[in-house]
């Protein structure tokens, strides 16, 4: 129950943070842009988005994954999501989050692959139980 509450609180914190920082960014579109762009290089609030939103969310999700050892699906999903947020916080994307860019963008994209690829894998694996 405690892990569920921690996960739910983290989800609310993340969603509220995304909505808040997007509202402070004129022209930002939740449909046309990635959330990584809220913390991209030279974005107005990039430091707080990366260190105050993405980093704590990533660390908490990794913690949830480590504490969920008895459930491989939840554990794997939480760790993959957490690693993605953790990497994105430490390696913010280039402006516009291009597919190809600087070395930092490449590391950022690898974090995204772990997050989305791992997320899809564990959700698919969980759907077959």
Model regions and ranges:
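A detector of repeated loop/turn-to-beta-strand junctions in beta-rich toroidal repeat architectures
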Residues: 31-32
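Hydrophobic, aromatic-enriched alpha-helical segments typical of multi-pass transmembrane helices
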Residues: 1-28, 42-129
């Amino acid at each position: 129950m405690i892990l569920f509450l921690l996960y739910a609180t983290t989800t609310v914190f993340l969603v509220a943070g995304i909505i808040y920082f997007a509202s402070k960014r004129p022209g930002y579109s939740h449909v046309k842009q990635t959330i990584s762009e809220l913390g991209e290089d030279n974005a107005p609030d990039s430091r707080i988005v990366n260190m105050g939103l993405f980093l704590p969310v990533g660390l908490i999700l990794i913690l949830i994954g480590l504490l969920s050892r008895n459930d491989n699906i939840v554990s794997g999903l939480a760790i993959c999501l957490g690693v993605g947020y953790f990497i994105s916080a430490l390696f913010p994307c280039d402006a516009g989050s291009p597919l190809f860019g600087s070395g930092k963008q490449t590391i950022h994209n690898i974090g995204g692959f772990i997050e989305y690829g791992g997320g899809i894998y564990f959700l698919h694996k969980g759907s077959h139980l």
